[in-house]
Amino acid sequence: LRFLLSTATLALPAVNTLIVVIASLSMIIGNVLALRQQNIKRLLAYSSIAHIGYVLAIISAVKVESAGFVSLYMAVYAFTTIGAFGVVTIMSSPYKRQGEAELVENFQGIFWQRPVLTAVLTVMLLSLAGIPLTAGFISKFFAIFATVSAQSWWLTAMIIVGSAISL
């Protein structure tokens, strides 16, 4: 992170262009692959690929605030991902066949059995998607703010498209 946030490194146009390309591909590919998943843990893993793209978008903005924005994004992302994985792990019953409890379809109607855990999982997933009134929304807002202030319109568009796909 220190290496990427150093002004000398990102001042090189080739390095910054490479980061923009990787960020764009990461956001789009990660979200598209997450859409196709039936396994909740794999869905969260592919979502992680997209979130790395959002972090790289902030890094490529090369502003003084970028380090703070990256730190905020990573803290929010870590909290929500650990929370989501934790709830999925708790909800996975040891009595079911291996991998069966991890299917998205097996979470249908789980609210009536475990309402508190379901509410926590819902909030975590809404935050990962960047829905307003969640910490994930604030993080994505700062990612958009960083790219707009750097006049990186391509990355701003990629963040918006990636967020729309993740919904």
Set out the residue ranges of the language-model regions.
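Alpha-helical transmembrane segments of multi-pass membrane proteins predominantly involved
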Residues: L1-L167
